[in-house]
Amino acid sequence: MKLHFTKMHGAGNDFVVLDGIQTPIDFTPEQWAAIADRHFGVGADQLLLVERSTRPDVDFRYRIFNHDGGEVEHCGNGARCFVKFVTDRGLTDKRTVRVEVMNGIATLTMQDDGQVTVDMGAPVFEAARLPFLPEGLPTRTQGDDTQHALQINGRTEWLSTVSMGNPHAVQIVDDTEAFPVLEDGPLIESHAVFPRRVNAGFMQIVDRHSVRLRVYERGAGETLACGTGACAAVVAGIRRGLLDSPVKVATHGGDLTIAWAGDGQPVMMTGPATTVFEGTLDLDALKLTAAH
């Protein structure tokens, strides 16, 4: 069986996008991981599935699968690619669409310059909703932000915890390029205080409207950009009193602009979405079977 796919990226965070409206798809985690494999599959940080919405007030259902095949709650860079995909394929003629994600609704808007703005919703800080188990950890307060300390590779690392629909732990570092992200990232990601694992963000503050960011993503490793990670980092910086909205977030894959008016308000993310190529996936060659 052959399946059409589109390869896209948002600031270097790359995706395989599949139209589950035209061809209903129900892969196992192992099958999703095989497609994402960069040597034996198409290759991607994550895979995006477009489906019909289950709600009358929403345009589409937006599902995200990590490189390891696990389904996750949200992906901001993927959301920008999602709206470009449904627009380019003629699945909608709306400039703004509402999509159903695992834990709520996201609003996506195509701008006249080709950039995409995503209403990421209001950040959540309650530990139980990440989930995060802070009992017994050292704590400190900076501005409106409460941080917790973990011992990682013999260092004390102070983390701000934020959910942007998926869990993030953000720390401020002096130099993102010099910091051992690839060593510390997986230790934070899989630490016992995060029962469902966590995305680990490492932010360098340039000035009050500009930061550099690297993110070690849950189930994907370090990626060139992470939209929800950029949102979480800016929220943490604003709550600490170190940043003012809007903030330019420089990642290895490109720049994102994040705006946030404060607690209880939605985070707005603006950035690029690019179609790289389209192709046909031979499911039999990958030893995959699509369930219809």
UniProtKB/Swiss-Prot annotation:
GO terms for cellular component: cytosol. Its main location: cytoplasm. It catalyses: (2S,6S)-2,6-diaminopimelate = meso-2,6-diaminopimelate. PROSITE patterns: DAP_EPIMERASE (PS01326). The active site is at C75 (proton donor), C226 (proton acceptor). Catalyzes the stereoinversion of LL-2,6-diaminopimelate (L,L-DAP) to meso-diaminopimelate (meso-DAP), a precursor of L-lysine and an essential component of the bacterial peptidoglycan. This is Diaminopimelate epimerase.
